């Protein structure tokens, strides 16, 4: 793939969406796995496969996927979650690659929440660089409770369901620490944007 692609990931409530917005403000093209995931499960062949595996109870009255119902079902059962991932993840990966390849600009930022779970570049070998946004567990926990209006126990369960912080940081080429200071965060993003533009210019010359 000729475009210089940077993968962005991070734990839940660490600030992936905020970081993506800051990069967009610098005229960086952003491709988001969550958006593609929503498109993938619209009525069509992928949704038909999901219904065949999980039953029609996962559908709303209008025939669309009841995302909240399915999320609650697979969250409580690892085997069910893996079955769902086996259906949707290959399609999402393909969609991400296509969208990234079509992106304009010197580089593209690809937001992939489960990048570490996919093995980093093992799952996405076309990424040239991986950026992880990180926050200390206490801050992450508090943000999640506030964002989703949930109690401490629910927040802990949601965080525990993800890959560990250590494993996520291990795949990083670059790390942004989101400590809640917008000036500090913006400065980190500006520095990284300049670095990625420089790397992309060299990559374009030799690709």
From Swiss-Prot:
Family annotation (Gene3D superfamilies): P-loop containing nucleotide triphosphate hydrolases (3.40.50.300)
SUPFAM superfamilies given in the database record: P-loop containing nucleoside triphosphate hydrolases
Pfam families xref list: CoaE (PF01121)
GO biological process: coenzyme A biosynthetic process
Sorted UniProt keywords: ATP-binding, Coenzyme A biosynthesis, Cytoplasm, Kinase, Nucleotide-binding, Transferase
Keyword rRNA-binding: no
Entry superkingdom: Bacteria
Catalytic activity field: 3'-dephospho-CoA + ATP = ADP + CoA + H(+)
Protein name: Dephospho-CoA kinase
Native organism: Xylella fastidiosa (strain 9a5c)
